[in-house]
Amino acid sequence: MKKGIIRFLLVSFVLFFALSTGITGVQAAPASSKTSADLEKAEVFGDIDMTTSKKTTVIVELKEKSLAEAKEAGESQSKSKLKTARTKAKNKAIKAVKNGKVNREYEQVFSGFSMKLPANEIPKLLAVKDVKAVYPNVTYKTDNMKDKDVTISEDAVSPQMDDSAPYIGANDAWDLGYTGKGIKVAIIDTGVEYNHPDLKKNFGQYKGYDFVDNDYDPKETPTGDPRGEATDHGTHVAGTVAANGTIKGVAPDATLLAYRVLGPGGSGTTENVIAGVERAVQDGADVMNLSLGNSLNNPDWATSTALDWAMSEGVVAVTSNGNSGPNGWTVGSPGTSREAISVGATQLPLNEYAVTFGSYSSAKVMGYNKEDDVKALNNKEVELVEAGIGEAKDFEGKDLTGKVAVVKRGSIAFVDKADNAKKAGAIGMVVYNNLSGEIEANVPGMSVPTIKLSLEDGEKLVSALKAGETKTTFKLTVSKALGEQVADFSSRGPVMDTWMIKPDISAPGVNIVSTIPTHDPDHPYGYGSKQGTSMASPHIAGAVAVIKQAKPKWSVEQIKAAIMNTAVTLKDSDGEVYPHNAQGAGSARIMNAIKADSLVSPGSYSYGTFLKENGNETKNETFTIENQSSIRKSYTLEYSFNGSGISTSGTSRVVIPAHQTGKATAKVKVNTKKTKAGTYEGTVIVREGGKTVAKVPTLLIVKEPDYPRVTSVSVSEGSVQGTYQIETYLPAGAEELAFLVYDSNLDFAGQAGIYKNQDKGYQYFDWDGTINGGTKLPAGEYYLLAYAANKGKSSQVLTEEPFTVE
């Protein structure tokens, strides 16, 4: 809903204002100019606003290598030596800045500390000789679609709901005795309700650590916490990995460790996320799952590099890819990690239904949870009951038992309307648009079968109900059998700067039923359905635990290669193969990975960018093929790329003795004069004995890719009461930048400011809360939209949460 309405209003705005250079109540925070001395200073990530005296927390990376980095480089490093160097750097930093305080310290996968200080003191911190880089302490959130969460009572949980683990092959692995036994999986999340009956077996005496409250009790945020909303996300993730009760996770005998890094409301910051990763490595975790992220598409962000070094320490790091799809370039940190396994979300196979009833030609099925519910509604005369906009109060005093609710779009999410209808006893719902035309959205997993109508048909239906025509019969037929589909919300790559394909792999992430705390003292433990890449990632973390038990000698690189090499290629509803940056290598299959005796790495590869002005340009990549079998094998290789002006060649045959490795070089030549600017995909196919053993996705980009012109925007309180600071991220700068204000109903309120020729990176603007040349915004909640245009392309992004004007 947000995207459609905002897009319409934005077009109107651009046509009307033509992006002139006038500004209203927004003033750019002055940028500090660089001098030759700056070249000797530490690098700043995120273009932090260093003009305000307001205190902020930053992550400080030191030149002294972390334990993991030194080990990888073959250098001698010890905790005592590193601690001495860190203490020396801390003392220098505290002496250099005013009112600075060190918070957390890091040594295992990141060398440095977090520090709170006035922002205008950061330049002095950068000048400290031992400091390598400074990062802002950005916010991380759970990667689930909160508006689609559904709580399920224990007696309603059935084996039919527990489909996703068997679908990726967990049951077959269990039959062979591979259940994740002996493997430690770290859940770095909102905490875990480890007393849940389905999770008790997975925890030992040591549960993990709580970095929010700084104690050894990493439970979820409870109801009534004055700091914010109760959480259940980490418990759901833990159940998907390893529940062992009514619900069975992918690796039911794995040992779990919980690290609470996200607090009330499912929100946390960089300093705690890095601390959680550090502690998991130090505690001996074999696998770690991070179902969290932000909108920063940057491979060198502190959390992303922390996962890179965790992988180098032999811990398989699995992370969600984000929920900002379906557009490209939407993957965020830590999904941008070079080494970790980033996971996209899919929806399990289902039947798509067509519906007819009455004379309502716009009728379409929006979504459903169980196919049996759809069949129960088919060819059955039912009574329709009008229920306003579907809020809980609209059902008060109405008998919906065995009936179908008719509601109007607006105010609350479709899933909430369906949940309210179900609670009132309804067996179905009809929702009609609140704008002219049809509803575009389809929402899988609606708690009751839901049929959508256009505004015109909806008003016609309501008129009929008022006239006493309340009975109808729905005729539902299967229109298409859909295979496993990539979820629209699943974020896409590539990663900026590295141009890497992301996600690496995909797994089920829609309508996943798992364990949750109910926060109800009488019935504290329950089950819930959630969706998001947060739900996909623990499927892979569990799969890794199972594979690691089956293949205890495999390295993190071998496990990653096995999962990617043996994945199933996914096709969309039209039978077209999904792009690499939508599905990665495909959908994971546990048994395929366990049975693999040939491994190809890397599991995907990007050749990077080819500049238009360079004409003919050639790049090579060497792939490693590992023969894990006890016999000599002969491998053949095929190379392909879409797009004219691109040719491929390389090693066509490699013979590898038993338990040995071989090399194959893949070459791509691009005539950029014949190839249009854009992103192009290829594949390296490796066969042995006529059987495909690996399909390796490849990628290249000609000239300037169609990256988003703006990726994030937020509003916070300004240094003066009643003012605000706007923060936005421009990946390559912007020729035109506008800030537009929308009220809580997403109706356009006015323009906050318009700019031209902005630099790349983080930009900060002081705003006095006025619109359209000085009009003060009335008290209430608002959203801010950032619109940026550069080199003929434009993008827009809306604040994730509303801000309050008092």
Swiss-Prot record:
The alphabetized list of GO BP terms reads: proteolysis
Tell me what PTMs the record reports for this protein: Probably undergoes C-terminal processing or proteolysis. Auto-processed to form active enzymes of several different molecular weights.
Broadest EC class?
hydrolase
Q: Which InterPro entries match?
A: FlgD/Vpr_Ig-like (IPR025965), PA_dom_sf (IPR046450), PA_domain (IPR003137), Peptidase_S8/S53_dom (IPR000209), Peptidase_S8/S53_dom_sf (IPR036852), Peptidase_S8_Asp-AS (IPR023827), Peptidase_S8_His-AS (IPR022398), Peptidase_S8_Ser-AS (IPR023828)
Q: Does the keyword rRNA-binding apply?
A: no
Activity regulation comment: Activity is inhibited by phenylmethylsulfonyl fluoride (PMSF), but not by EDTA.
Cellular localisation? Secreted; Secreted, Cell wall
Q: What happens when the gene is disrupted?
A: Mutant lacking this gene does not show significant decrease in CSF production, but the triple deletion mutant aprE-epr-vpr is defective in the cleavage event to release mature CSF.
Please list the residues that make up the propeptide.
Answer: 29-160
> What is annotated as the active site?
D189, H233, S534
List the EC numbers from the record.
Answer: 3.4.21.-
Q: Give the similarity note.
A: Belongs to the peptidase S8 family.
Task: Please give the name of this protein.
Answer: Minor extracellular protease Vpr
Q: Which organism is it from?
A: Bacillus subtilis (strain 168)
